[in-house]
Amino acid sequence: MINLLDFNKTELVRFCGEMGEKPYRARQLLRWVHQSGKTDFMEMSDLAKGFRHKLMECAVVQLPEIVSDHTAGDGTRKWLLSTGAGNAVEMVFIPEPSRGTLCVSSQVGCALACSFCSTGRQGFNRNLSVAEIIGQLWWANRLLEAGSHDPFPLDTTRVQTDKPETRRPVTNVVMMGMGEPLANFENLVTALDLMLSDDAYGLSRRRVTVSTSGLVPALDRLRERCPVALAVSLHAPNDALRDQLVPINKKYPIRDLLAACERYLPAAPRDFITFEYVMLKGVNDSVALARELVQLVRNVPCKLNLIPFNAFSGSGYERSGAEAIGNFRDVLMQAGIVTTVRKTRGDDIAAACGQLAGQVRDKTRRTSGCGTGQPAVAR
């Protein structure tokens, strides 16, 4: 059976054509599935009955299964979605008065093995399908519209948009969950197409952000195929330190990464790149490194986002203190670089990316008598 959640509009037009249907049927299907949240073809009332019966014979709308739902005291909400074989991925909703941001995963685990990342410690299992990526947004809109566990509902009067579609609970999407989005390139781009489509979620390019650790060739392809807002996980101002924290830097060093960022800017929906910098106590948080960072990025239109480290068991790192973060920020701001410190959210629900999914995987392995290596099969 074909899962229609795997198709963007172009692919749905082709699919409908193969069934002898007009292109407008694709638009109808997109709206029923992504805007109305329907998964039963018989409820799609403006489709001809004959077409609905044909769809039932060859297609489904199959979503990933929600296996747990956690809400923090600050309103942050994290869901776990089963991906089979005892594995799970996470999506996180961060409510604010003027926006609702959904953090979306792109892979089960991650092969890049960043030393401070809980997901990276789990290793790589597989890429998520388009349905598993876009299904996170589908689920978030449905669950949040239901109103349960949402102490901070979106104030739509403060949302800067002309599109009624973005008055749904999720107004912004950041591809900053589990996995390296650009390592799952084709599925990522198809999911982005759906996020941006007026027949699906109607988000603007400025409200969709892809975060990357620095896959330079794929970054160039994203610029050509679907340029959305860009965030780069930098975390160090020199190759020696970044090689330790972000091993992909050995293949695509900082000089090549910054050159790719400069190539990306003319196509980007924003006139700057966001550089993310996790603050690790005694590792990358000194004033000297802040000054080095100023020299590195001063000619690139950018914003720096300093991220207090979310500790997890066995990480070997600690979060920088408030004074160290403040001193680091001050050096950047005094140099004229727009700098923010990310507000820590969801500390009471295992906020570190991949932490809850890792707990599920570890529990499954223990139950099945498995050690490291191939993932256990859930029973």
Swiss-Prot record:
GO biological process, one term: tRNA methylation
Name of the protein in question: Dual-specificity RNA methyltransferase RlmN
NCBIfam families reported for this sequence: rRNA_mod_RlmN
Cofactor binding: number and manner: Binds 1 [4Fe-4S] cluster. The cluster is coordinated with 3 cysteines and an exchangeable S-adenosyl-L-methionine.
Enzyme Commission (EC) number: 2.1.1.192
Domain Radical SAM core: 96-348
Family: Belongs to the radical SAM superfamily. RlmN family.
Gene3D superfamilies per record: 1.10.150.530, Aldolase class I
Catalysed reaction equations from the record: adenosine(2503) in 23S rRNA + 2 reduced [2Fe-2S]-[ferredoxin] + 2 S-adenosyl-L-methionine = 2-methyladenosine(2503) in 23S rRNA + 5'-deoxyadenosine + L-methionine + 2 oxidized [2Fe-2S]-[ferredoxin] + S-adenosyl-L-homocysteine; adenosine(37) in tRNA + 2 reduced [2Fe-2S]-[ferredoxin] + 2 S-adenosyl-L-methionine = 2-methyladenosine(37) in tRNA + 5'-deoxyadenosine + L-methionine + 2 oxidized [2Fe-2S]-[ferredoxin] + S-adenosyl-L-homocysteine
Annotated source species: Nitrosomonas europaea (strain ATCC 19718 / CIP 103999 / KCTC 2705 / NBRC 14298)
Disulfide bridge partners, by residue number: C103-C353
Entry's localization field: Cytoplasm
Residues binding S-adenosyl-L-methionine: G179, E180, S211, S233, L234, H235, N310
Gene Ontology CC terms, in alphabetical order: cytoplasm
Cofactor(s) the protein needs: [4Fe-4S] cluster
Active site (UniProt): E90 (proton acceptor), C353 (s-methylcysteine intermediate)
Stored PANTHER family: 23S RRNA METHYLTRANSFERASE (PTHR30544), RADICAL SAM CORE DOMAIN-CONTAINING PROTEIN (PTHR30544:SF5)
Molecular function per GO: 4 iron, 4 sulfur cluster binding; metal ion binding; rRNA (adenine(2503)-C2-)-methyltransferase activity; rRNA binding; tRNA (adenine(37)-C2)-methyltransferase activity; tRNA binding
Keyword Disulfide bond: yes
Something else known: Reaction proceeds by a ping-pong mechanism involving intermediate methylation of a conserved cysteine residue.
Pfam families for this protein: Radical_SAM, RlmN_N
